[in-house]
């Protein structure tokens, strides 16, 4: 290994291991479905001329590229790469560097004990969103979707961290009065009328939301002359439990302790949120990662899938459409 910046083994995935061990409800593997073997490492950041020498030739380095034993990663004169190994170790390669992936478990020169496979699995599950599987349906939205005049955006098909979530919607007539309704297991929990806004944070004075419980919400017009009233889709969400929230806090803090690039930290945070089905939070982190690498089509594909999974089909179609336009 030459001109390689000092190997740093951070506590990035110590807490992630705890996350996965607790069997989060967002597990993505279907029963009876064989999963391909996980790679030994993955490129989580790739800037400039990065190449991977492997059996069969040379592969251009790219975000999310899986790495196997024998692969040699090389960076150009003004390039850098960040690699996450299956034992939780993290390596940053500076310009003009090279490193080879070795062994069934990469044994990096570090005094820190390996973290295990679970945290790596969290990141791998997130990166699987780049797969073209399912993108055909997103592409179909590009030409076949109908614009909803009143649409509940967030939270939708997701879990939330706070018992005071912020509800966000789209409406073509912002001057018209709306009514937002929150439903619990026993029916209507809270209602409120508003005008001229497209979001509302659940107030302290409203009936409290219970961690672990599932809720739904809608917005609709109140004008008696509009018959029938215009009503949004019903959006569902679940409040995460106190125990899970505590574990997540530790996981996110550990990621912040590392010296990974800002883009990589956003990707890692998004991976944790995705593992717990906190899709809105995963979307926000992926958006921030993409803002730092706007031409990263892999991140664009992941974001499109996250939009689709969280019910934001218009944004999914727009994002995927931009990918198709570049092809």
Regions from the PLM with identified roles:
Residues 138-260:
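Long, contiguous interaction/recruitment modules in multidomain scaffold/adaptor proteins
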């Amino acid at each position: 290994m030459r001109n390689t910046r000092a190997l740093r083994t951070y506590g990035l995935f110590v807490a992630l291991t705890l996350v996965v061990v607790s069997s989060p409800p967002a597990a993505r593997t279907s029963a009876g479905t064989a999963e391909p073997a996980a790679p030994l490492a993955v490129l989580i950041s790739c800037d400039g001329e990065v190449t991977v020498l492997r059996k069969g030739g040379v592969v251009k380095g790219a975000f999310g590229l899986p790495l196997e034993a024998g692969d040699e990663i090389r960076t150009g004169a003004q390039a850098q790469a960040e690699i996450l190994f299956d034992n939780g170790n993290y390596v940053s390669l500076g310009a003009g560097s090279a490193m080879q992936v070795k062994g069934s478990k990469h044994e990096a020169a570090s005094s820190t004990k390996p973290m295990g496979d679970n945290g790596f699995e969290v990141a791998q599950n997130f990166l699987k969103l780049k797969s073209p599987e399912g993108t055909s349906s997103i592409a179909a939205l590009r030409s076949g979707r109908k614009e909803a005049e009143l649409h509940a955006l967030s939270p939708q098909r997701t879990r939330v961290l706070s018992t005071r979530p912020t509800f966000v919607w789209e409406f073509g007539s912002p001057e018209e009065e709306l009514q937002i309704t929150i439903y619990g297991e026993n029916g209507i929990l809270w209602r409120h009328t508003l005008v001229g806004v497209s979001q509302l944070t659940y107030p302290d004075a409203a009936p409290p939301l219970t961690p672990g419980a599932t809720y739904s919400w809608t917005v609709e017009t109140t004008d008696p002359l509009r018959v029938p009233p215009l009503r949004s889709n019903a959006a569902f969400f679940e409040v995460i439990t106190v125990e899970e929230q505590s574990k997540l806090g530790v996981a996110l803090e550990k990621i912040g302790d590392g010296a990974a690039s800002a883009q990589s930290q956003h990707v890692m945070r998004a991976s944790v949120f995705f593992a717990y089905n906190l899709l809105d939070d995963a979307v926000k982190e992926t958006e921030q990662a993409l803002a730092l690498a706007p031409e990263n089509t892999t991140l664009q594909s992941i974001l499109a899938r996250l939009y689709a999974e969280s019910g934001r089909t218009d944004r999914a179609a727009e994002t995927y459409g931009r990918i198709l336009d570049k092809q």
